[in-house]
Amino acid sequence: MAHEAEAKELLKAYRQFIRHFDGYYERDVAYYETLLKELTLGIKQLVTYRDAHGTLCGYLIYQMQKNDLVVKEAVYMESIALQRMMKEILGDHEAIIVEVSQSEKLEKIFTLAIPKRSAFMMARINSYPLFNKLFNAKAKTPKEAYAILKKPLWLHEYY
């Protein structure tokens, strides 16, 4: 377990992770360079997980908010990477707050997890004809548009 990585490594891990989602933000090396600069301020922290070959297999960005340990972003290739990173940051804290997509089902990995649903995203389709043409769909409402997605959304962004 380490607390450092290069911007290119973080981007590569992110791109591998988002393959499992239909909705996500496009990021580049500059995004991660900005993030790494912010981490030097000490408000947020980074923990990484690497496999036996030294390849980055996941990272967590977390911070203390009042008395709570809050994971701001969790990117991982396998559940073991997530488990080990969470164990690393838990330390003497009693609990960790993590926001994930509904499809990630962390309660299967962490049996004592208490899932809570929270709505936090709003979407607007500016041109239904264009949307329907691009996605070969017949959506008339945002709810219908979301229904055509085959993978969950992953929309966590700071910069």
Regions flagged by a language model, labelled:
Residues 1, 72-159:
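Active-site/acyl-donor-binding loops of N-acyltransferases
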Residues 1-80:
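Amide-forming acyltransferase catalytic core, primarily the GNAT-like/NAT-type
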